[in-house]
Design a protein with these regions (language model features):
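Bacterial N-terminal signal peptides that target proteins for export
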Residues: 1-8
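Ubiquitin-like/PB1-type beta-grasp interaction modules and other compact soluble beta-rich domains
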Residues: 2, 17-124
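Bacterial N-terminal signal peptides
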Residues: 9-19
Length: 124
């Protein structure tokens, strides 16, 4: 009887150990690849490839990779400087997502799959 109780105890402990490891495996966050290119003629040329949390917005991902200066607007944060290079006068930071100019700001671009983002200083 004591032998059966010991075996039962070991099986029970093993089951709880296995269940704990399964729970941790399910809680790991998924990531996607972000390829980021920042260009401004002869002022800055930065390229980086990084894994970021799936579902994060592009603004948060960019901010984690490079120093970003912003102006708060009613539409969300407007990027004013990247890596210390400021858009002044008639220039702005144009946002391209997977090769196409974005119709929304970086705050509204959600990274659900591997994404290529280019921020290029352009004239109005």
């Amino acid at each position: 009887m004591k032998l059966n109780l010991k075996i039962f105890s070991l099986l029970l402990i093993g089951l709880f150990s296995l269940q704990s490891s399964i729970s941790y495996a399910d809680e790991t966050s998924e990531t996607v690849q972000l390829s980021l290119v920042i260009t401004a003629s002869d002022k800055i040329n930065l390229t980086t490839v990084s894994r970021v949390e799936k579902g994060i917005n592009a603004y948060k991902a960019i901010k984690a990779l490079v120093v970003v200066g912003v102006k708060d607007t009613s539409y969300g944060p407007q990027i004013m400087s990247l890596g210390g290079v400021e858009a002044v006068g008639n220039t702005y930071w144009a946002l391209y997502v997977n090769g196409a100019m974005s119709m929304v700001g970086a705050h509204d671009v959600i990274l659900l799959e591997d994404t290529f983002i280019r921020l290029n200083m352009e004239d109005f």
